[in-house]
């Protein structure tokens, strides 16, 4: 199975052409969040339509820079990974969008308790899968992936522990 996952598009789909062959032959595309820059449904739809030109098999979640409307829109489209789990063959994919609180006060920050609840809910849907993939927009705390420009760690302890 070929799964391609990426995030932080922030409405810029110009680089999709660079990975067109990979996108076209993937079994699944996973978008991990930050589809927009503090925008909603209309901008999200543009991003999704751009990806769907290459592959219609998508699972998507919102990021901390997407407004909550994006989360609701993805649910109406039946592709929302946030707090959800999907079986794709023998692979279970579950996720949590948004982010733990940051110094930037972005539109979609959620508590560590909520992150745990969303991850648990999604995991429970795929717990019997042979293989499991956890997709989180917020990185695990105190790792190389959660360091912000001032050197501070801004990731989630819950993601790290899970």
Regions found by a protein language model. Give the residues of each.
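Broad hydrophobic/π-residue packing in well-ordered secondary structure
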Residues: 59-60, 92-93, 161
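A general structural detector for well-ordered alpha-helical segments in enzyme core domains, enriched
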Residues: 19, 46-50, 118, 155-162
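Extreme N-terminal starter segment of soluble prokaryotic enzymes
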Residues: 1-4
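Conserved catalytic scaffold of divalent metal-dependent phosphoesterases
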Residues: 11, 66-158
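Core catalytic region of metal-dependent phosphoesterases/phosphodiesterases
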Residues: 6-88
